[in-house]
Amino acid sequence: PRRRRASSGRPVRRRRRPKMSRRRRRGGRRRR
């Protein structure tokens, strides 16, 4: 298992991201 490094250079544990947030771009409307 590889560890991801933060910009500071320290080894960082991988954070879990909800994958649903990636699909949110489906409605092509922009909010201002």
UniProtKB/Swiss-Prot annotation:
GO cellular component annotations of the record: nucleosome; nucleus
Subcellular location: Nucleus; Chromosome
GO molecular function: DNA binding
Coiled-coil stretches noted in the UniProt entry, renumbered to this chain: none
Predominant location: nucleus
Tissues expressing this chain: Testis.
One example of a Gene Ontology biological process annotation: cell differentiation
Region of interest: Disordered: 1-32
Tree of life domain: Eukaryota
Keywords, comma-separated and alphabetical: Chromosome, Developmental protein, Differentiation, DNA condensation, DNA-binding, Nucleosome core, Nucleus, Spermatogenesis
Signal peptide: none
Function of the protein: Protamines substitute for histones in the chromatin of sperm during the haploid phase of spermatogenesis. They compact sperm DNA into a highly condensed, stable and inactive complex.
Other noteworthy facts: The heterogeneity indicates the existence of other protamines.
The protein, known as: Protamine-1
Naturally occurring in which organism (per UniProt): Esox lucius (Northern pike)
